Amino acid sequence: NNAPDAHYWLAKSYLAKEDYQNAKKTFITFQQENPIHHKFANSLLELSIVHAELGEKNQAVTLLQSMIKKFPNHNSSIKARKLLRFIISR
């Protein structure tokens, strides 16, 4: 079934086009429907970027903190830590 991959890449394309509302909805749908997908951790990082771009600092910080805690050794955790420091410093 390629539907989960399609949802993930659709959300990424919305993010790339700076269509943050659709990116947010699509990442959330992807996460709710695919909690064990191999791109799940990446989607948490990307959704936190969406939250930050929408001015939703608290949601971005909370999501990044939970992503780092749940996936401490994931390659996206390094980016998540950097983004968290950046958001907090703003």
Locations of the language-model features?
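Acidic, polar-rich low-complexity tracts and alpha-helical solenoid repeat scaffolds
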Residues: N1-R90
